[in-house]
């Protein structure tokens, strides 16, 4: 089984999707560039419609509309295909712009990060180095902060005092500081 897991994230995914890359994903980059004005290529038509939603800007998708989710999936699915079928990385999971890859060796994990970065650059996107890491398996099924907050002992009689709430929020704040993110505090609230 896998000995390592890669967690990777795309830098500013929606704002960094270049509208021309929609056509690249659907029709291949070389064919799209040769026929970039041909609206019979539905990738070019989607490109033009996406530009029109942003005052003819070619960089970035609007965050929020369902159409942006669909368009991002077109581009990212093309990247997934290349990773799996060209680069031969089979143990990939992706949720929107977050990649998880299971590797048998540390070298394989590093190779995946390199290949993912190359595939993203083809579409003028990049990895978020701050959120990309290789972790050794096995890992706990939950993050440490989740375990700590779930194990907090509230009174069984249902009588919760200000002191109890303060202690719980102090724990959540401490977990947020250790984790380097606000998620534990949001979870507690």
Where are these regions (language model features)?
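Conserved polymerase palm-domain catalytic core
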Residues: 1-96, 102-115, 158-189
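Polymerase palm active-site segment centered on the conserved acidic dipeptide of motif C
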Residues: 106-167, 171-174
